[in-house]
Amino acid sequence: MTPTIITDVKSFAIKPDRHNLVVVKVETNKGISGLGCSTFQFRPLAVKTVVDEYLRPLLMGRDANEIEDIWQVMNVNSYWRNGPITNNAISGIDMALWDIKGQLADMPLYQLLGGKARTAIPAYTHAVADNLDDLYHEIDRFLAAGYRYIRCQLGFYGGNPSQLQTPEEPISGSYFDQTDYMETTLKMFAAIKEKYGNQFQMLHDVHERLHPNQAIQFAKAAEPYQLFFLEDILPPDQSHWLTQLRSQSATPIATGELFNNPMEWQELVKNRQIDFMRAHVSQIGGITPALKLAHFCDAMGVRIAWHTPSDISPVGLAVNTHLNIHLHNAAIQETIELPANTQSVFVGSPQPKGGFFYPMEKSGIGITFDEEAAADFPVVYRPHEWTQSRTPDGTLITP
């Protein structure tokens, strides 16, 4: 096979709608270019700098066909590795190289990887409201659209300190009463189960805001409601507690969106401490490591449910779709509603139909990036507070 020489690497940090997105474009001497997702919305300019200043000079003139070797070179080039900024930068290039290879082969990515493992991947969406009546309205809307898996949440991950008993002059920010959260959420599960029966299966995201003993109590109490999975019940640095949790509860556990380093998941998967791996593909370095992780999980009976939040580019969404169509142990795909500006910048974005994502048939990843449209939406950064929830006494909760 004749070499496909990398002639340029470009990065784009944009904010077409609510979130900052980072996209990488790799150009070649054959006139074929590829796209990749490097989105890390909390540090977009840091990721862009790594792509532009460090990875671009490293890759110029290399053969784009050599994906595995290029990934290994990018991973070890800085010596210190497996951090979210570098991993996301690597991901953008890695995805773009797979996109190029698919176009050269005139095959969609899922076919390049080995073909379909299923006709379509089930999708789940998010029903979020401040009260049960509004939540029922959201659920009804999604049921009518064909969804049979719905993540149900009452409120956001925190509240106003004026609503809680706090010390005088509390620190400003988002507050979270763990006991109240557990009681309210269990009542929500019961109410939804009573109203809808088995019309759909619930999912729920704790977002790591419980202490280990609370997590065990909560997982046990959730058993009667037969959740599809309970997500991120503990932060990664408390994952060893999952051994005790698994011994006391049959509620399916999903985790992984904060993982960067293989050492964070190897023991969890090997010891079957989770049911679903929720890794964020760009956060672990792209398609190349995602395939290795998925195959490792498959051997251990752990299913895949890639993290697909609203702060992911349509390129990342498309990659998840291709992976989920191909991988034997893919279980479900999170879905997001793409706003109008985002759709104008990224043409060909996958959309669920009747509660499923179907195969994308264009060669490569299948997304077109409109650089002129993107130029109208420069990146805008501001500090985010939602990661900084506090208990009523003011203690910061580790997500």
From Swiss-Prot:
Keywords: Magnesium, Metal-binding. The keyword Chaperone does not apply. InterPro entries: DgoD-like, Enolase-like_C_sf, Enolase-like_N, Enolase_C-like, Mandel_Rmase/mucon_lact_enz_CS, Mandelate_racemase_C, Mandelate_racemase_N_dom. GO terms for biological process: amino acid catabolic process. D-arabinonate binds at H207, E257, R278, H307, E334. One of its GO terms (molecular function) is magnesium ion binding. Coiled coil: none annotated. Mg(2+) binds at D205, E231, E257. Pfam families: MR_MLE_C, MR_MLE_N. The keyword Translocase does not apply. Transmembrane segments: none annotated. Gene3D superfamilies: Enolase-like C-terminal domain, Enolase-like, N-terminal domain. Belongs to the mandelate racemase/muconate lactonizing enzyme family. GalD subfamily. Has no detectable activity with D-mannonate and with a panel of 70 other acid sugars (in vitro), in spite of the conservation of the residues that are expected to be important for catalytic activity and cofactor binding. May have evolved a divergent function. This is D-galactonate dehydratase family member EGBG_01401.
